[in-house]
């Protein structure tokens, strides 16, 4: 499980699905980040009253991640209907890749070669070295500066 912070989540707002943006409107950035980190990809049913015990203890699960007020706000908003906590795959992948590249740069700063760094970091980040090389190449290509004489020639 990849945990994400509210600041990181805010950085990738454009990649979030509408359902995540709705949760942000109800709960705010910090609570939504905690909710996605804990339950992303799961459908929960927050029934209240007599049917609460049939919900599988969702209220208890929510309170393990959200404050009492946040949990109540979410339950009020949903009205007891089942709800899907989005995984936010694209946003999480973007954050993971940024973390990976940052740590790769740090490893190289300590004297490790790229290949040594990849051997250490790829398993930790759950990516293959081929994917890592693609990330490195994409970053390199995005940082290349156009020649001043070529700027705007074909744009």
Residue spans for each PLM region:
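Short, amphipathic alpha-helical "recognition" segments used to contact nucleic acids or chromatin
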Residues: 93-115
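Acidic (E/D-rich), amphipathic helical modules within compact regulatory domains
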Residues: 53-71
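Short Lys/Arg-enriched helix C-cap and helix-to-coil transition segments
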Residues: 143-155
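DNA major-groove recognition helix of helix-turn-helix
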Residues: 136-139
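A general alpha-helix detector
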Residues: 15-22, 57-61, 117-120
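Short alpha-helical "recognition helix" segments of helix-turn-helix
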Residues: 23, 110-127, 132
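DNA-contacting interfaces and partner/effector-binding or oligomerization modules
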Residues: 1-53, 72, 80
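Basic, amphipathic alpha-helix used for nucleic-acid engagement in HTH/winged-helix/SANT-Myb modules
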Residues: 13-16, 68-93
């Amino acid at each position: 499980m990849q945990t994400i912070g509210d600041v990181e989540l805010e950085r990738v707002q454009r990649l979030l699905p509408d359902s995540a943006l709705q949760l942000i409107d109800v709960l705010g950035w910090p609570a939504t980040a905690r909710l996605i980190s804990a339950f992303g990809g799961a459908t929960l049913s927050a029934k209240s009253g007599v049917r609460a015990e049939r919900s599988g203890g969702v209220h208890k699960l929510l309170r393990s991640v959200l404050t009492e007020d946040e949990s109540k706000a979410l339950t009020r908003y949903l009205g007891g209907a089942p709800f899907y906590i989005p995984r936010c795959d694209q946003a999480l992948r973007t954050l993971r890749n940024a973390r990976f590249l940052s740590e790769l740069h740090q490893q190289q700063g300590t004297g490790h070669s790229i290949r040594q760094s990849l051997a250490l970091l790829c398993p930790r980040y759950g990516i293959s070295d081929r994917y890592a090389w693609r990330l490195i190449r994409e970053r390199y290509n995005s940082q290349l500066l156009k020649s001043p004489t070529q700027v705007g020639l074909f744009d």
